[in-house]
Amino acid sequence: MSDLPPPDLGSEEISVSPTSSSSSFVPIDKNQLQDAVQVVSEAKEFNSLILDYVRKATPASEVNNNYHIVSVFGSQSTGKSTLLNRLFNTNFDVMDESNRSQTTKGIWMAYSSIITTSQGPVPSKGGENIFVMDVEGTDGRERGEDQDFERKAALFALSTSEVLIINVWEHQIGLYQGANMGLLKTVFEVNLSLFGRTKLEMNEHKVLLLFVIRDHIGTTSKESLAATVTQDLIKMWDSLSKPQELAHLQFSDFFDIQFHTLRHKILQPGEFTTDVQLLGDRFTDHKNEDFLFKKYYHHDIPIDGWTMYAENCWDQIDKNKDLDLPTQQILVAKFKCDEILTSVFEEFRSKFEERHAKYAPTDIKEEVDYEELGGSLGDLKEDTLENYDMMASRYNQSVYLQKRKTLEQKITDVYQDLVDQHGAHMVSKLSAKFASSLSSKKLPKDVSFALATEALRKDIVHQFLKNCSCITLNGSLDHAKHVTSFTRKLDSILSKQRFVELNSILAKSLKKVESAVAKAITQEISEPSESTWDRVLEKFKGAQDEYFYSKYETATGVDFGLGTSASVNERALEKFQFRAWSLLHLQMRKLISKDNLVIILKDRFEDKFRYDENGIPRLYQNSHELELNFTAAKEHALKALPILTLATLSDGTTIVPKYDVRDKRLQKKLGAAFDTTGEVDLKDEDVESDTDEEDEDENEPKCFAEAISETDKASVLSKFKKETDATFVESKRALIQHVTHIPYYIYIVILVLGWNEFMAVLRNPFFFTLLLMLGAGTYVLYHLNLLKPAMVVVQRMFDECLVIAKQKLKEFIDEQPQEHAKRLSKMAGITEDKPEEIEMSDLTPPGEGS
């Protein structure tokens, strides 16, 4: 192939090849004729520069699929080249009539710029771009019995052309060799092997066999000649050996047959020209009922792909390999579509990186407009596919569509990375927004938590799906995993918040119940009675009804309005009940502790011992009265002890809680708040070590109703006895001091001896006023029944002053002997011995420091 001269349409020099007819390119009149290029040399070498010829003859981008390939086939020296030159205004070499020999060697092709018609020359450009191939004639003496090239050339023409002109003389009709029937049979057999299986797939492609009958005299009509040829062809087709699966295929499934007659060129030149013009009409006039170009004749390959397709076909034919023409067309389409795909995808990547690098989620600080981003992605994808469609839709449709899907997938892969980044970013951002919005302070107060969160979740999911729809081009990109991840995260956040709210509801309700229970117990223990614990239990249940059951109890159970499951609600109810009973038990233990119980008993004792039924302080006049009241007060105080230490109802039964609040397993299971995932019940073996009987405190109460243990009760009794006994002794001492009084006659003596002083007081206005005030105060105290308490207070003050005076006198008396001894020592000149002081000399040599 290297010795083939390159096409040069701009030069008028003749390039001579020793193996060609005269030259590979023929100089012509450029106003009407076109140069011809040798496609396959007589040495079976394919010219790989055909595309350059096509591009120079007419731009390939303008031709696109708007072209037709016409080949001529027939015996040598039958005027094939002459016919093409006259009809298509080409300039193929023609035979020198003075020397009948082979003119066309190999296969040549030329672009037909003008077609001869009855309306005159019709330009090919802008209409039907026709490329004409002149095939070397058959049955030539130059090749003799070597029919290899003839067969290969016929196969090549059949494989690459839409219309195959079979040039035959009228007198050859009915002959076998003269009409090239033997060669046609070979062509049919190969055609069956090439296209047979594609016909099973409903392939509509056909080849038009246009028989041009030369030197038609008119004695035998064209219809009669056509019938003869058609019968011979069908008979020959039926005689072919076909595979079983192709036996049903008919001649008409592969070929269409048309006929045209030409009168003698020399003897009837005018009629010959007219017949050529009429044949030209059939190539150009779409309205002509005998128009030759049909859509299903075309190979559906753009002109730039056809040149590659033709080269591949010849390579397979020349190497005597099985020629699968559809496969060759597909290979060409694949190569070209891959080339186009690579080009448009590189352009796409460049634009994508330029436009959308700013949308990388790691660099995003401001809010992303996903609608704008999605629109930009969609426009870029659409532009890329349009560019591909414009260039690749000219090729085999199945390959074009397959490669289009490949391009779409490559674009999808690029977009998918961006979608995954934004999807993860949206999951993180919107879930954080959802978690923040779940705060009870931000939710509406007029609806339940479940309804509010459902609406909030719906809005967040709608926003997420809307953003996903924008950037996934209405769902064409995969975002299911992000939707799943997002919904799971929302469910997790919502589940955690539900338990937070549930814990809050339980805590608030229990706090109010605890406050009510503490208040009830505090009120009842001050004045305990047989029905004390009935009232405490009633207030305990009433507080539960008021703060819990009235709000959350329904006909089917409890509902907190949080959207929690029935099982969770049931466990919450169990927790509330257990913790409520635990709080009751805790308040009992707290308010009726050892110290508090001693105080309660002492207060009851003091109230009975020191005050009468009217609340007036008692002033005991004798020991008998004191002892009786002491015993009564003590019994009164101790009546409360069994009531307070054991929660017993008026019917004699003790309070039994619904749950054993002292059970450590239940304390772990029901005593704690819900965790964020919903508490999992503990198994008995999980707390086995915590329920070991050896670890139980002996001082602990044995049951729920016991406020304190028996040991603590004994301690309370002992302490109470000591304190009450101390009170009794104190009162007894005061009574004795009060009973030991001054004799009455002393007052008479004082009155007689101090009469003058009394009169002096009465005559003195100041003293008289003071006396009136004291008298008025005494009168008021008497009428208020406070005289005795006042006297007791005065007596105690006097006693206290007396004690202090005695103490001071004692201190003074103790100091007198010591002071007297010191004065005597001074008068005698006795001094205390003092230690003798001796001064030490400094023995350190002069000039030396310490």
Swiss-Prot record:
Keywords: Endoplasmic reticulum, GTP-binding, Hydrolase, Membrane, Nucleotide-binding, Transmembrane, Transmembrane helix. The keyword rRNA-binding does not apply. It is found in: Endoplasmic reticulum membrane. The chain crosses the membrane at residues 742-762, 766-786. One of its GO terms (cellular component) is endoplasmic reticulum membrane. GTP binds at G74, S75, Q76, S77, T78, G79, K80, S81. One of its GO terms (biological process) is endoplasmic reticulum membrane fusion. Residues 64-297 form the GB1/RHD3-type G domain. It is a multi-pass membrane protein. Residues 1-27, 816-850 are annotated as: Disordered. The keyword Hydrolase applies. InterPro entries: G_GB1_RHD3_dom, P-loop_NTPase, RHD3/Sey1, Sey1/RHD3-like_3HB. CDD domains: GBP. Residues 763-765 are lumenal. It is an enzyme of class 3 (hydrolase). This is Protein SEY1. It comes from Meyerozyma guilliermondii (strain ATCC 6260 / CBS 566 / DSM 6381 / JCM 1539 / NBRC 10279 / NRRL Y-324) (Yeast).
